[in-house]
């Protein structure tokens, strides 16, 4: 099973492609897309192009994206929402099921600490995956992919089922990553 993790951002978009075979995790590819100092629309276009190329190269079966952090300023949340939209569109265009996880859930699954800092995320990526991420965006993206793999509640369908059928079966059997306990219908 190969999963793409995306840590969206308009200035730096981290990505991590992680493969799982049994209990073994392997980094297929990871890095950070840095579109440069351009107007917003052009930065988002470059991120979309980079994610499209990455998906074509790595051929993940599913994508996982970090959800918006609610404590951000309204302007930061808007910009992050636009970058998330690009990440979601790239995955949807490739036909990948997309799963979203809260930052604290990702940190808990990756480090065992839901409030882990950037240094702890980088250290865990080195220790757990043997990766050497240069930026926290890359480590976060790897963590998002690992979190998704940890949350999967089933085995991958047998070989020969085909990529599309395997992806549909995977999406149908996943547990929700969060539940709404507010009681509203």
From Swiss-Prot:
Q: List the disulfide bonds.
A: none
The family classification in the record reads: Belongs to the RuvC family.
Question: How does this chain assemble?
Answer: Homodimer which binds Holliday junction (HJ) DNA. The HJ becomes 2-fold symmetrical on binding to RuvC with unstacked arms; it has a different conformation from HJ DNA in complex with RuvA. In the full resolvosome a probable DNA-RuvA(4)-RuvB(12)-RuvC(2) complex forms which resolves the HJ.
Q: Name one GO cellular component term.
A: cytoplasm
- Known catalysed reaction(s)? Endonucleolytic cleavage at a junction such as a reciprocal single-stranded crossover between two homologous DNA duplexes (Holliday junction)
Q: Mind telling me which residue stretches traverse the membrane in this protein?
A: none
Annotated binding of Mg(2+) 1, by residue: 7, 137
Q: For this UniProt entry, what is the primary localization, expressed as one broad class?
A: cytoplasm
Q: HAMAP family from the entry?
A: RuvC
Cofactor remark: Binds 2 Mg(2+) ion per subunit.
- The name under which this protein is listed is Crossover junction endodeoxyribonuclease RuvC
Q: Which residues form the active site?
A: 7, 66, 137
Q: What is its EC number?
A: 3.1.21.10
Q: Which cofactors does this gene product need?
A: Mg(2+)
Q: What does the UniProt record say this protein does? A: The RuvA-RuvB-RuvC complex processes Holliday junction (HJ) DNA during genetic recombination and DNA repair. Endonuclease that resolves HJ intermediates. Cleaves cruciform DNA by making single-stranded nicks across the HJ at symmetrical positions within the homologous arms, yielding a 5'-phosphate and a 3'-hydroxyl group; requires a central core of homology in the junction. The consensus cleavage sequence is 5'-(A/T)TT(C/G)-3'. Cleavage occurs on the 3'-side of the TT dinucleotide at the point of strand exchange.
Q: Which GO terms describe its biological process?
A: DNA recombination; DNA repair
Listed A to Z, the keywords are: Cytoplasm, DNA damage, DNA recombination, DNA repair, DNA-binding, Endonuclease, Hydrolase, Magnesium, Metal-binding, Nuclease
- InterPro entries xrefs: RNaseH-like_sf, RNaseH_sf, X-over_junc_endoDNase_RuvC
Where in or outside the cell is it found? Cytoplasm
**Top enzyme class:** hydrolase
- Kindly list the positions annotated as binding Mg(2+) 2: 66
Q: A GO molecular function for this record? A: DNA binding
From which organism does this entry originate? Answer: Anaeromyxobacter dehalogenans (strain 2CP-1 / ATCC BAA-258)
């Amino acid at each position: 099973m190969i999963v793409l993790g995306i840590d969206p951002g308009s200035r730096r978009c981290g990505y991590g492609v992680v493969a799982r075979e049994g209990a073994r995790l392997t980094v297929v590819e990871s890095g950070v897309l840095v579109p440069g100092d351009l107007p917003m629309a052009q930065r988002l276009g470059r991120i979309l192009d980079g994610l499209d190329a990455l998906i074509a190269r790595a051929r993940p079966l599913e994508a996982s994206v970090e959800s918006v952090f609610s404590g951000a300023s309204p302007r930061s949340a808007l910009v992050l929402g636009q970058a998330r939209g690009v990440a979601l569109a790239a995955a949807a265009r490739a036909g990948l099921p997309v799963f979203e996880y809260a930052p604290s859930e990702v940190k808990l699954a990756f480090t065992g600490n839901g409030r882990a800092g950037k240094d702890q995320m980088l250290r865990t990526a080195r220790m757990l995956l043997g990766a050497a991420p240069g930026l926290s965006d890359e480590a976060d993206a790897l963590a998002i992919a690992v979190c998704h793999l940890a949350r999967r509640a089933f085995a991958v369908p047998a070989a020969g089922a085909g990529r599309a059928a395997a992806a549909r079966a995977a999406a149908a059997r996943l547990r929700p990553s969060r539940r709404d306990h507010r009681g509203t219908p």
